[in-house]
């Protein structure tokens, strides 16, 4: 299999943030923040080697260590994990990212990342507002975040990305724009601005408020040289895009290792036509994940058929400002994208919210504001055509 992305999930946290639904554990199963945890690291590396061998993966093109809170790992564990991942690589990993909370940043930790070959930091700032941090269960502070950014700026020579969230409890329009402006003033290379996700439906007024926050701050970022290349991601002068995340959005293969880590391996013929896909997700039980002798049992596999894969290509691809590559789509699915959702594309093009180019189909800046509505229309048309377009069923599995 060609080079692939690798995602590593570190499930440890000191406390659970109120808005977070990622799998994590706090000080149990033998975990203590900043202490060595060699058994956990070795188990991760065993699974990395196993997947790489089983699927004949040539190399890791990108690596992303997320969580949870990877910055709670002991510096020695970071060195061991990074070295094990890079073992056998003929070329360095092109992009090697680790997530961190600002309050965990210190010189020794940064040195361990550099020595391990990690070349990109993703810092979960979320907000500089101390009141908003407190009400949302974050353990950091404005002062600690500023100290962390100053430390990184003086000691880190790789890429830097920072996350902010729009719609946090207690947040105002002014506090978010102040947060965005502060990152701009630091000239952070890459900024992610996410709308708050909630398991429970938000009131329409709250949804509208979050949408307006995103619109206003997207404009602020654009005015300061940040190019929006994905609905929630901005690259300064378009030189600092996340290579790993583009694997997700372009529906390319990646492996997920660790409890709750998800990965998708895609099988195509020599011409790029989709054959099958397998999705693995680590079990959400750190105890069983650590002790199971049969490693296939902790990464149950789901087979993704062509219909579902096509839907996912649409869901992910239209998040990108460049949209979906038409020739690549046609190679994968045996027909141009207009054969599947042509009516939706033409309708949205008439509204000037979509562009149908020779090589790409994409939403305009205005269209991206209504991404969810567009996807509902597109999937509805896809479902209709799968049932009976032009008087006969469309063979999506052919």
List where the protein language model places each region.
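Flexible, acidic/Gly-rich N-terminal and inter-domain linker regions that tether
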Residues: 1-7, 14-15
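Alpha/beta-hydrolase
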Residues: 8-10, 125
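A short, conserved structural fragment
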Residues: 349-359
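Local cysteine-cluster metal-coordination motifs and their immediate loop/turn environment
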Residues: 11-24
């Amino acid at each position: 299999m060609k080079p692939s992305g690798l995602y590593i999930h570190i499930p440890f946290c000191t406390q659970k943030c109120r808005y977070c639904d990622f799998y994590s554990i706090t000080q149990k199963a033998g975990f203590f923040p900043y202490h060595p945890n060699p058994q956990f690291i070795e188990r991760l590396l065993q699974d990395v080697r196993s997947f790489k061998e089983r699927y004949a993966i040539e190399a890791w093109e990108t690596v992303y260590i997320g969580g949870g809170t990877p910055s709670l790992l002991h510096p020695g564990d970071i060195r061991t994990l990074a070295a094990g991942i890079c073992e056998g690589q003929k070329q360095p990993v092109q992009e090697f990212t680790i997530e961190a909370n600002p309050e965990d940043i210190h010189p020794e930790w940064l040195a361990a990342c550099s020595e391990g070959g990690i070349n990109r930091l993703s810092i979960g700032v979320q907000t500089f507002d101390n009141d908003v941090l407190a009400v949302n269960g974050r353990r950091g502070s404005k002062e600690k975040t500023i100290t962390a950014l100053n430390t990184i700026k003086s000691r880190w020579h790789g890429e830097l990305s920072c996350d902010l969230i729009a719609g946090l409890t207690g947040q105002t329009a002014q506090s978010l724009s102040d947060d965005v402006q502060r990152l701009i003033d630091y000239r952070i290379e890459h900024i992610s601005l996410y709308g708050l996700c909630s398991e429970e439906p938000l009131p329409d007024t709250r949804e509208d408020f979050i949408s307006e926050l995103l619109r206003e701050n997207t404009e602020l970022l654009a005015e300061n040289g940040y190019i929006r290349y994905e609905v929630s991601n901005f690259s300064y002068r378009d030189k600092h895009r996340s290579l790993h995340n583009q694997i997700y959005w372009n529906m390319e293969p990646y492996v997920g290792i660790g409890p709750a880590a998800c990965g998708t391996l895609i099988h195509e013929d020599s011409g790029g036509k989709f054959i099958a896909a397998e999705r693995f997700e680590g079990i959400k039980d750190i105890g069983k994940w650590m002790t199971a002798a049969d490693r296939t049992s902790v990464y149950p596999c789901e087979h993704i058929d062509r219909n579902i894969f096509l839907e996912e290509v649409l869901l992910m691809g239209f998040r990108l400002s460049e949209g979906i590559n038409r020739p690549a789509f046609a190679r994968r699915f045996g027909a141009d994208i207009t054969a599947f959702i042509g009516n939706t594309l033409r309708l949205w093009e008439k509204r000037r919210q979509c562009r149908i180019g020779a090589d790409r189909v994409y939403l305009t800046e205005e269209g991206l504001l209504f991404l969810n509505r567009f996807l509902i229309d597109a999937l509805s048309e896809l479902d209709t055509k799968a049932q009976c377009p032009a008087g006969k069923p469309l063979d999506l599995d052919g």
